[in-house]
Every structure is written in C-alpha cells, then in structure tokens.
C-alpha cells in the first residue's frame, strides 16, 4: 500500500535529501516544488516566467501561480499509489487548499514530517549545496561526506551520475536566504502556519524530527515512524 507523505522544513534542513531517500524506498514520486518551478521556468511556460520574478527576489511565489502547478502534478497517474510533497504548502491558505483538493480527489494525507533545524545551521547548509544538472533528486553538498561531490578532471561532479554541478544564485545570497527563512518561520502567514494547521487537523500523523543529526540518523528516525 502506498504512502502519502508531506515534508516540512526550512531551506537547508535536508528535507529534499530525505524525500529522495523515502522516494527510493517506497518507489513513489518525490514532488518537490522548487524542481517544478525550475522545470516551468526552464520550459518558458507562462506560470514559470511569472514564478521566476518572485524566486529571484527571494519572495514567496503567489498562490495563484503555485497551486495550479502543484495540483496538476498531484493529479498525474504516477501519484495514485502514493507521493511525497516537499516544499508545498507554504502557507495556511495553501494547506487548506491542499486538504480540500485531496478530499475532492479521494486521497488521504498519511504523514506530515517536520524537520526542525536552527536557522544559522540551515543557512550554512544552503550555501554548501550543489545541484546536479541532470537530476534534482541527486543531492550533493560540499560539507557532507555522505553526499559529497566527487572530483573528476579537476572539478567536482555529481556523486550519483557524474553530471555537472551548479549553484542556485539565491543559495549564495545571504539576504535572500534570510528572507526565505523569515517566510518559513512566520507563524501567522508563513510556512509554520501551514505546519500548525496540520498539527491541529484530524487525520495525518505529524512527526517532528531533529534536523541537526546526521543524514543517516535523520533517515533512521523517519523510517521508524513510517
């Protein structure tokens, strides 16, 4: 039986890495909002071009752009046996819309996993991460041995496929990072409002995990709860 899992955590908490691990174990799609944004932006779609303006400023992409992207992805056939949502919802309004959409589609949200991490540690992690140009589900980080890029022909390449690596411009911008974290930790209109919504909702099992532990330790804690 598939599992419908929602990951929460500030940028740099490792939720994307953990999502990829859970994806592999349960063979369900890892729906990462940032990757979907990048696909739309790279494809030059109307929604993608609109989202790009907000992302480059470190602002939250408005609901009228984000929600159509995410809902359309959830409705694809590969989500029927389970899915992982990472990076969505980011506000209470989005959380309510997601819950309503799931109910309409006859889908349940089984688990909500919240990875908790100090803001300063999260910032350091963000600035050290690298993106594989071939697959966003290939996590690489210059400071973590478990997912450290490998050196080839004098440069660092993806540890999984050997592809080129890149950094996101907003990952190297301290002001943009602070702005994103400010949005996440805002309990009135930010992502924490969505977290609290699910904590108070009937249905999903909410699991809080200490994100300061090693990648392997965090994975072990998550797997014990699923």
Curated annotation (Swiss-Prot):
HAMAP family: Adenylate_kinase_Adk. Keywords: ATP-binding, Cytoplasm, Kinase, Nucleotide biosynthesis, Nucleotide-binding, Transferase. The lineage of its organism: Bacteria, Pseudomonadati, Thermodesulfobacteriota, Desulfobulbia, Desulfobulbales. Residues 32-61 are annotated as: NMP. The keyword ATP-binding applies. It comes from Desulfotalea psychrophila (strain LSv54 / DSM 12343). Monomer. GO terms for biological process: AMP salvage. GO terms for cellular component: cytoplasm. Its main location: cytoplasm. Gene3D superfamilies: P-loop containing nucleotide triphosphate hydrolases. It comes from the Bacteria. AMP binds at residues 33, 38, 59-61, 87-90, 94, 168, 180. It catalyses: AMP + ATP = 2 ADP. Belongs to the adenylate kinase family. Pathway: Purine metabolism; AMP biosynthesis via salvage pathway; AMP from ADP: step 1/1. Its EC number is 2.7.4.3. Pfam families: ADK. This is Adenylate kinase. Residues 128-171 are annotated as: LID. It is found in: Cytoplasm. ATP binds at residues 12-17, 129, 213. GO terms for molecular function: adenylate kinase activity; ATP binding. Consists of three domains, a large central CORE domain and two small peripheral domains, NMPbind and LID, which undergo movements during catalysis. The LID domain closes over the site of phosphoryl transfer upon ATP binding. Assembling and dissambling the active center during each catalytic cycle provides an effective means to prevent ATP hydrolysis. Catalyzes the reversible transfer of the terminal phosphate group between ATP and AMP. Plays an important role in cellular energy homeostasis and in adenine nucleotide metabolism.
């Amino acid at each position: 039986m598939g599992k419908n899992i929602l990951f929460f955590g500030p940028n740099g908490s490792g939720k994307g890495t953990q999502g990829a691990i859970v994806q592999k174990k349960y063979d369900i799609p890892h729906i990462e909002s940032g990757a979907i944004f990048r696909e739309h932006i790279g494809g030059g779609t109307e929604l993608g071009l609109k989202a790009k303006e907000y992302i480059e400023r470190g602002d939250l992409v408005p609901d009228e752009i984000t929600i159509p992207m995410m809902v359309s992805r959830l409705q694809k056939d590969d989500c029927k046996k389970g899915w992982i949502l990472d990076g969505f919802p980011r506000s209470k309004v989005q959380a309510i819309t997601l819950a309503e959409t799931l109910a309409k589609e006859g889908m349940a949200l089984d688990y909500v996993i919240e990875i908790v991490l100090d803001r300063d540690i999260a910032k350091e992690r963000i600035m050290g991460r690298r993106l594989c140009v071939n697959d966003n589900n290939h996590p690489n980080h210059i400071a973590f041995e478990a997912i450290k890029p490998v050196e080839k022909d004098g440069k660092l390449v993806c540890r999984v496929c050997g592809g080129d690596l890149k950094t996101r411009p907003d990952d190297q911008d301290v002001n943009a990072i602070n702005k994103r974290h400010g949005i996440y930790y805002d309990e009135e209109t930010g992502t924490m409002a969505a977290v609290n919504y699910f904590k108070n909702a009937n249905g999903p099992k909410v699991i809080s995990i200490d994100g300061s532990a090693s990648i392997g330790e965090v994975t072990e804690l998550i797997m014990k709860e699923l």
